[in-house]
């Protein structure tokens, strides 16, 4: 099994040596348990390496404008160096409008229009934590990503779309799948690597991939991931699962992004 936690520990150890204490403000809307757990992990990581983190919590039915005003307040706060809006947001809130309000220099997830534009042009400055985590795992396993066939089961702005651009820039051929993709197995069984990040248990099964495929489960549903039969998947593939896989590395990359935001201000 591929150990993403080991790579995360190496990165956090390097960050711990830095003589700086940047502050992260996290905006959490609603009672999604997976989101709350992920926020707790980010706070714990920040405190461990001498960074600072705080959470602004809001109820599920909050108006979009209130969230935008909270983002703008963080933009103006001189003691806040990075802002993270925990996704997903409730359906009444537009992610696009929220990230349009976020100051690019404080965007630790790389989701403002300016940062997304740079990623799409192949000039990323800040990548979403999960995207860089997956890239690092593939890099560790393969070195070069040229000519790699990758199937990504996720087409969100947080993971699937930026990941496809980053891997394409590295010379990989990427197939991006979404909830309406028919015959998913047709796309997964041809791949050298499969990344799944849907938050839906059982979306990817061992019989859907070839022997020796690299499989990265970046899904997060209360620490369980997208794959049910993990033991069989681990025997058949080079498997990076949940817990202990992409999740801890995603958190570590977020801390690295926070430091970069701090240095750029």
PLM region descriptions:
Residues 1-20:
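Positively charged, low-complexity intrinsically disordered leader regions
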Residues 22-24, 150:
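Conserved hydrophobic helix-helix packing surfaces used for dimerization/oligomerization
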Residues 29, 34-43, 125-210, 214, ...:
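Glycine-rich phosphate/diphosphate-binding loop of Rossmann-like nucleotide-binding domains
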Residues 46-60, 174-176:
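Short beta-strand elements in bilobed, periplasmic/extracellular small-molecule ligand-binding domains
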Residues 66-78:
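Short, well-structured alpha-helical segments in soluble
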Residues 78-80, 191:
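Short, high-confidence coil segments that cap the C-terminus of an alpha-helix
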Residues 84-145, 202:
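Anion-binding alpha/beta catalytic cores of soluble intermediary-metabolism enzymes, centered on
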Residues 96-112, 116, 216-265:
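Rossmann-fold NAD(P)-binding glycine/threonine-rich loop
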